[in-house]
Amino acid sequence: MSLLSIDDIFIPTSDLLNHSHNNKRLNYNQAKQTLLLNMNGSYPSSNNPISNGEPCDAKSNHLGGEMHNGVGSKLENGILKKAPDIPHITNNIIPLSNVLKFYTQEAYKQLTTAIENLSSTKDTENDSSRKKFFLNLIISLRQDFIKIYTLVKWASSSKDISKLIDLLNWFRSQDFYFEQLGYGLNELNRYSGAKLPNSDIITSLEVFIKKRPQLPSYNLISTPPISSEKTLEVLKDLNLTLMTRMALINNLPKRFINNYEIRDGRVYFTIQNEFQVSVTVGNDLIIEQEDDYYKSPFYFIDFKFLFGINPETALITHKDNKIITKLPKSSFQNLEKIVNTVLLNSGLGGLYDLLHKYSISFKLYLIARQLKDISINSKWRNNIQFKYQNGKSLILINYWSSHYLSRNWKSFIELGIDKNYNLNFRWFKNGTYELNHGISGIFDRNNIKKQSDASDEQQNNIEPNEESLEDLREDNNEDESEPQDLSVDLILNIIVNKHSEMLMDKIYETIVKRLSDQEEYCSFISCHQLLLKLTPNKSVVFAINPLTGFFYFIDPSPIQNQVTKKINTQSSNHKNKPFFSENDMVENIVNQLIQLKLEMFNKEINNKLITSGWINNEIIKLNDYETIKLSNFLNGDNFNNSNYNKIQFYRCKNWPLSWFLSNLVSGDNFRTFWWVARIKSIKGEWKIQWVQQLKFDQEMETSDELTLDYKFFNNLSSLCSNMIIDHMILEELQTKKIQYIQKQSKEKAAELLNKFQIDEVKEENIKPEETNNPFVYESIIMLYNDNRLLPVSNSSTSLFLKIKLITLNNSTQMKLKLFGNLRNIPNTLAETFNQLNLHISKSQNYFEINDIVNLSNKINDSSIKETRLLDSILLKLNVLNELIKVLYQLDQNNIEIVNSSIDSIQIKIDEESNNLTIKLPEMDEKFSLLSSNTESNEMKLIISYLNKYLSMTSKVQENEIIGIIKYFKEITPIVKTIKSVRATLDEKNKMKLSNGLSKLNFDVEFQNLNLIQFVYFLNHTNVNSNKKILKDKIVIKLNFMRNRFNKQDRLLLKLSMKDNLNSRNLKYKKLFELIYKGISEVDTTNGSKITKLNYDFIVDSSLINELMIKITDAFILFLSDNA
C-alpha cells in the first residue's frame, strides 16, 4: 500500500470545481446551472428552479421530464419508473484506517530506530547534538500527526464530498454525450449523394432565347468546299492586314525589324543562325492601340532551327541552309501551345525572347552532344568532365580532370546564355571567375584562329567580381556576321593553352623573384617550355602538357622523374588546407625545381669528391643548433632557408676518427661553402666540437663562386689535412695549458724572429730525397713561456714551434722544430747539455729541439684515443727545463754531480756511500729516486718513503730536491751506525740460551723519515720452566731536530730512552747505568757535543756511530756479567 500525503487526499475536492473537457475553472453556482440546463429535471430541494434562465415548475422541465427529490422519473406504458442511480466512484480512494495504521507503524519505527542509534553514539557524539537529532525527529512526527488530525476532521464530511465527486463524474459523461450528438448532426450536411444537381441556367437561357439548343454536329453535316479564289482572296486580305499590323507595331523587337517577310497570309521572322518562325492573325481587324491587341492576337504557324550538326565534320554549322533542324511532332505541338500563350500575353516581344532562348538552349544541347562524343572518342578522353544542366541552359566543362588542381571541379568553363540571351562563356579557376583573360569571340571560328596564333597581352591584376553568367556581355555577339562551324575541341584548346601559358608565366616570375641574382637560371624557350640551368654545366627543359595540365622534363633523369612525380602531386604541406590555389601549386613547383637544382648540383660535387678518393658519410645529421655553428662563418650569406641548403660530410682514408670535410650547397645559387670539423655522436646526437671554414687562395676568395675543377679537388685533401694537423697541434697545446699565438705566415714569422733577435739555424743532415721534394705545408706557432716551459731567466717569454710536412715514399712526415733563446747557462754544465743531444749555440744564445712524426702511422692508429703529436718534442723540452733547474740548484748548493744523462742525474753523497740517482720527470710525471742493487735494505726503505712523498706532492720544486739530497747526507751517518751496530753484535754477541737462541737481538724500525728506533731484545728463560722463552725490549729512539739558538743551519740528533722507564725494566737498572756510563765516555774532543736533557740526549751526527757502539757494548757487558 502506497503512502498518501494530505495534499493527495485533498485533490478530489479541487477537481469538483474543474471542468475537464474545456479546462475552465467553474464555481459552484456555474456547475449547478449547467446541471439544470442539460438534464431532464431540476435541481433537488430548490424553491426556484431555472430553465433557459427562466423560472419553471419544479415538477416538470422544458423537455417534458420530471424530477422528484433529485431523482429523475418517466412514464412508460402509464407506469412511473425511477431513473437509474448515478454511478459511485471508488477508484483511487484509500480507507482512513489504512492511513492511520501506516502512520502509526512508521512513527513507532522511526522512534525505535532513533533510540537505538542514540544509544550507540553515546561515546562518539555530545549530548547537545544527540538531543537536537531527537528533537528534529519529534518535530517531523508532530507535523505528520497534524496532517493525520486534519485528515480525520475532513473524513467526518467525506460522504457529502463523495456525492459531489459522483455528481462531477456524471456531469462529464453527459457533456461527452451532447458533444457526440452535435458531431452527428453536423455530419448530416455532408451526404453528397442525397443532394440534387444545380440547374442548367445557360441551356435554359439558350432555349428561351433561340427556341432551340446549340448542339455539336460531329461532322455529320457536310460543309461546302472553299474555292481557290476565296482562299487567295483571304490570303491577300491577310497579307494586307499583316502589313498594316506590322507597320503600326511600335515595340517590335530589334532583331525582327528588318528580318521579316509577309507572304502566304503569314509573317516569316528569320533570325540568322538561330531560327525561322511564321505567325498570322485570325481576323482582319486593324489594331492601332496596344490595349486592343487581345481582340486580334497573333497565332503560331511554323518553326525551324537554322543550324544543325554537319554530318561531314560532326561540328555545329550555320552556313548550309540545307542543314536545318525541324522539331518532332510532339515537340512541335508542345511548342505551339507555349508560343500561342506567349503571343496572347506578350506579343511579338515575348515570341522573340522565347524562341531566342530556345535556339540558344538547343545549341547548348548540340554542344553537350559534341562534348559527349569527344570525351569518349578523342584526345580529351579522361581529361575532361562536363555537366549539362538543361533546366538552366548551362554546360560546365571541367578540364584537366585528372590534375589535382582541377579535380573535383576546381577549374571549369561555363557555357550558357548571357543577359542578352546570347551564347557566351565564363572561366572559373583558382577559386574565382577569371574575367580579365583576354579571350574574346570564342564562338566565332575566325576569332578563335586569330587568338590561337596571337599571344595574349599582359594580364591586369584586377580581382573579378562574383557576377552571374547573365550579367556578362561580349561585343562579338552583337555582330551579325555569319559565324563558322562551332568546334568545342578548338574552344577547349584555346582555354587550356591560355591556362598553361599563365601557369608558366607565374612559375617564371616566381623563380626570377626567388633567385634574383641567378637570372641565367631560368629562360623561356616557348610559352609552354622553360630552360632551367641545374648545374654550371648542365641544363634541362621543363614544360607543361596543355592537354592534361601535368608538368614534365624533356629527356629526364631518374631524379628528375622523382621531382616530376612530386610536382604533379599535391604537396603534403597543403593537403589539410580547405582550398589549394594556383599560387600554392606554383610555390610547390618552384620549391621542387630549386630542390632539384640543389640535388643535381650536390650530386655533381659528390661524384667529383668520390672520384677524388673521398668517402661520403650519410649517417651524420646535424640539428638546428649545431647547424648554426656553421652559419656563423658565412658573414651575411643567406643561410636561413635550410630547406634549400644541403650539407654533406666526407673524409679521407688516412684521417683521424671524428674528422670530416663539411660541404654546403645552396639551392639559391651555385655557391659552395667548405668546413673542416670534428664531429662526435654524444648520447645519440651529433655534436660539432670544432669547426673551421676553409680559406682558399686570394683569387678564389674574391670570386662569388668557386671554380670546381680538377685543381680545386686535387688540392682540397692537402688543405684539409693541413688544417686538421694544425688544430691537433693547437688542441694538444691547449690540453697541456701552453698559451700560443695562431700560426703565422712566413713574412710575419720572420718579423717575430727578428724582433726576438733569433737567427734560425739552417737544417743540417738533410736527406738527398728531401731536397727534390717540395714542402707540402709549413707554418710557425709562437708559444708563450710563462716559466713552465723553460726558466725565463735562462730563456725568454716566447718560443717558436715550426711545423713542416713532407711526403716521402707515399707517407706523410711531420718535421717539428722547437727553438728559441737560451742564455745564462753555467759553464760547469756545458758537458751535461752536450749529452742531451740538443743543439745549443751558447755564442748565439740559441737552442733547438728537432723531432719527426710519421703521420701515416700516427693518425691512422684507431687504438689511440687521443693522438699526441708533440709528446716527444715537449718531453725533450721538459727534460731540458727540469735539467736546467736541477743542475742550476745543484751548482748553487755545491753538490757534486757524478754523472748525468737525458733522463737522470747521479749525485755524490759522500766518499763511502753509493751515489744517489735522480730520475728527471717526463711530461706529467714527477721526480723520483732510483736505488741500486748494492744498497742496504734501510737505504732502499728510505728511498721508497721519499718516492712516496714525491708522488703525493702536487708540485715538486727544485729546492725540495736539494732538501732531499741534504736529507740523504744527514741520514747517511745513521745508516752507517746501523751497519756498525750489526757488525759489533756479530763479533761480540756469543751468549746463547740453553736452546741455542741468542740472548741479545737487534732490529731497526723506521716509523717515518724523522723517527728511527734501535730495538734491543733481551731473551731469557723462565725460572719455573726452561722451555719457555721470555723477551724484553729496550727501545732507543733517534729523530732529527734543529737547534734554534745555533746560527748554523745544521741538524742534530735527539736520542731518547723515555719509553723504557717502566716497572718491568727495574731489573735492568744496572744495564741503564752501564748505558749512561758508556755515553759519558764518548770522545768529544773534536768539538762535537753531547747535551743531556733528563732522559734524552742531543748529539751531533758525527758522534752517533761511537755513541751507539758504546750502548751496544753496554748490553753485551750486562749480559756477560749476569751469565
Curated annotation (Swiss-Prot):
Its main location: nucleus. The gene is RGR1. Transmembrane segments: none annotated. Keywords: Activator, Nucleus, Transcription, Transcription regulation. Residues 450-484 are annotated as: Disordered. It comes from the Eukaryota. This is Mediator of RNA polymerase II transcription subunit 14. GO terms for cellular component: core mediator complex; mediator complex. The keyword Transcription applies.
